[in-house]
Amino acid sequence: GIPCGESCVWIPCISSALGCSCKNKVCYRN
């Protein structure tokens, strides 16, 4: 539930390496 400051509209979350995932076109962690 914490925004990672990254969007995932066109590309996947680069921050997925830090445990972030795409939700509603924004990358979140927990």
Curated annotation (Swiss-Prot):
PTM annotation: This is a cyclic peptide.
GO biological process, one term: defense response
Pfam families: Cyclotide
Tree of life domain: Eukaryota
Keywords from the UniProt entry: Disulfide bond, Knottin, Plant defense
Tissue expression: Expressed in fruit, pedicel, stem and root but not in leaf (at protein level).
Disulfide bridge partners, by residue number: 4-20, 8-22, 13-27
Cross-link Cyclopeptide (Gly-Asn) placement: 1-30
Family to which the UniProt record says this protein belongs: Belongs to the cyclotide family. Bracelet subfamily.
Domain notes: The presence of a 'disulfide through disulfide knot' structurally defines this protein as a knottin.
Role noted for this protein: Probably participates in a plant defense mechanism.
Protein name, per record: Chassatide C3
Organism expressing this protein natively: Chassalia chartacea
